[in-house]
Swiss-Prot record:
UniProt-recorded name of the protein: Myosin regulatory light chain 11
Annotated source species: Homo sapiens (Human)
Subunit relationships: Myosin is a hexamer of 2 heavy chains and 4 light chains.
Domain of life: Eukaryota
Modification type N,N,N-trimethylalanine: residues: A2
Entry comment describing in which tissues the protein is expressed: Expressed in fetal and adult skeletal muscle.
The EF-hand domain, residue ranges: 25-60, 95-130, 131-166
Physiological role: Myosin regulatory subunit that plays an essential role to maintain muscle integrity during early development. Plays a role in muscle contraction.
Amino acid sequence: MAPKRAKRRTVEGGSSSVFSMFDQTQIQEFKEAFTVIDQNRDGIIDKEDLRDTFAAMGRLNVKNEELDAMMKEASGPINFTVFLTMFGEKLKGADPEDVITGAFKVLDPEGKGTIKKKFLEELLTTQCDRFSQEEIKNMWAAFPPDVGGNVDYKNICYVITHGDAKDQE
């Protein structure tokens, strides 16, 4: 008797379909972000990975309660598929400007609406899809920092999502 062929199961709305929500470039960018957060490179993001990631961004005194709340957003261990699913759920129906602003807010723990030029430049030239010196030069020409060396990220977010600078009233 010949072995039965296994039927392919499809899960509608399940985690296996999360890969269809994003194109290959986006998935690769999420993979790079996952790798940056997975500090110990074990393929799972845990509380210590989050703590180390915050420390790398200069935020040293993150409370356990805050980390626990982040970990509870997942139903179990956070591997790449779970990570992608979590982002897919958060991004579904979200305003792109709000999503991008939210990403910048992570880098602005004091909620000032600005990020230090030096810190942003370091991130953009050393992490994931690295900016060239020419791209950095163009960015500062388009979004010059203030006299204190701070960059208004809300204007950057607006331009990314709308293609033109906000009118200063």
